[in-house]
Each structure stands twice: as C-alpha cells, then as structure tokens.
From Swiss-Prot:
HAMAP family: UPF0761. It comes from Shewanella sp. (strain ANA-3). GO terms for cellular component: plasma membrane. It is found in: Cell inner membrane. Keywords: Cell inner membrane, Cell membrane, Membrane, Transmembrane, Transmembrane helix. Residues 292-337 are annotated as: Disordered. This is UPF0761 membrane protein Shewana3_0311. The chain crosses the membrane at residues 4-24, 45-65, 102-122, 137-157, 183-203, 213-233, 247-267. Residues 328-337 have a biased composition (Polar residues). Its main location: membrane. InterPro entries: UPF0761_bac (IPR023679), Virul_fac_BrkB (IPR017039). The keyword Cell membrane applies. It is a multi-pass membrane protein.
Amino acid sequence: MTKKIELAQIQVLFLGIWRFLLHLRQRLVEDQINIRAGHLAYVTLLSLVPMVAVTMSMLSAFPVFKGIRGQIEAFVYENFLPAAGDTVQVYINEFVGNASKGTAVGIAALVVVAIMLISAIDKSLNNIWRTKEKRSVVVAFSMYWMVITLGPVLVGASLVATSYVVSLKLFEGDALSGVMPLFIERLPMLFSVAAFLLLYMVVPNQKVKFWHALLGAVVAALLFELGKKGFALYVTKFPSYEAIYGALATIPILFVWVYLSWMIVLLGAEITAAMPEYLDYESSSNINETNLDGEPLAAQNTPAVEPETISAQSSQEVDTMGELAANAPQSTTLDKP
C-alpha cells in the first residue's frame, strides 16, 4: 500500500514537471526569445565599450579599487568571456583608453549608450513578465543610473571582501586548506546566481517571489557555466572561426557567445515568470491526475466489480420491486348507476 502511494506521488510529480515544461515551451514560442536575444546581443556589442568605460571610471573614483582593478578585469574576462577573453581584453582596454580621451560631449554620449543597453534589458524582461504598467521616466532613469554607478562598486566590493576572506589566517590550517580552493572554484557560480537573482527580482515592474527568482537564477547559472565550458571546448577543439576569419575571428566568437548568454538569461527569466502562472493554474483547476499510461489515478484505487455481483444486485432489486407492487393497496372502482 505504501509503495503504491509513493508510486502515485512520483507519477504526480513527474506529470507536474512535464506540464510545467509544456507551459514553458508555449511561453518560449510566444515570446520568441531567440529574436529578443539577438536584439540584446546587438545592443550589447554596441554598448560594450561605453559600458566598460563607465564601469572603469566608477572603479577609479574609489581608491580602494585601484589596486585590484587588474584582478577585477581578469576575473570578468576569464569567467564571462571563454576562449577569447585575453584577446577581447586587449582590444576593449585599447578602445576604452581612446574613449577616455574624448570631450565631455563624447563621454556623455557613452553614458547614454550604456543607458540604452540597460533600457533594452528592462523592456525585454518586462515583456516576458507581461507587465502592462510602465515606470515613469524619472524612476526608470534613476534605476538605470543606479545600476551604472552602484553595479561596478558592488562587484568590486564583493571581490575585495573575497580576497580579504581568503587571506585570513583562519583558513591556513590543514583542516580548512582544501575548503578555500573549492570556494574559489565555485565563486563564479555564486556570482552568477547572485547576479541573475538580483536581475529577476529588481528589473520586472511587479512583485517577484524570492523562490521563483532563485529557481530561475540557479538554472540560468548552471546553464551559463555549462555554456562557458562547452563554448570554450568548441572554440579550442574546432577552430573553424579562426580558419575562416583569421585575425578577425574574435568578432564572430564574441557575438555568438553574447547571443548564447542572452538566450540563457532570457530562459531563466521565462522560468521565473512561468512558475507563478503554472501554480495558479494548478490550484484553480480540477484536472484529474493521470498516470503515465493516461489512466486516472482515482480509478486505480477503486476496487473492480465482478459481473456476477452486478447481476445478483440487479435480480435482488427486481424481487424488491415485485414485493412492493404486491403489498400496494388495490384501487376500488365505483359501479355506474
């Protein structure tokens, strides 16, 4: 009996996951995230140099970050731009150096382009959440400016704190000697989860539950880590881009990776947005749970009725009706005068 109950619960669980995946697939088709990812990748490439220039300017404004600027750059390019990170870092640093020599109007234009990227991200995520109410211009600009100014500061502060924790003598013992390398190895994964979680909870112009956002963030972070390893393996083992494009191979490699990254980000957003819809649908509907063969689970717990039992019950009902008819009072008739 207990095994049957456990089997039924497992069937219900897998069927629930399957129905959620079907709902998620329908959402992905409706929202066309491949087109949205292509748009965001194009805007990202246009805004990459301005965004990096603004980020480095914000880090330079704080003396505590001057000593670790190289570490921050190495961490970002190594963990978020696989295979071609070194080449991209050289070019972007050169572009940023040229951009920093511009006039005030040019620097203001860089800030505007960086804001355009954040605005495109905001619109894409709010479209996924089916948000009808738009933020006012003042609120939207304030949020975009906060992301540009506070985002680099938070990233730098987290890396500084991590470097400080690693350097503590508390972790120099034999018992904890293997903990820190494992922690440092998982650090990019933790940063990815935190970044996706913050993105899915703050950007949508509606309330998002923490656990829903955490689910989407964890899935997106796992796919991002797998994507990094898979893309780096493809670029190194199958150097078709370098054979075709030569010295310009970095450009298509960067574009493809940015496109895949946005596909992963939007997929995590779709999971986060689809979860409350699916739960509301399940709670409001009275759909009969079925097993993997399509049979109702309720019917499995109903005992089978033999044909002999049905015929015996039918004959007993006929005899009862005959007795009632025999005991009924006879109607009297009046003679005609």
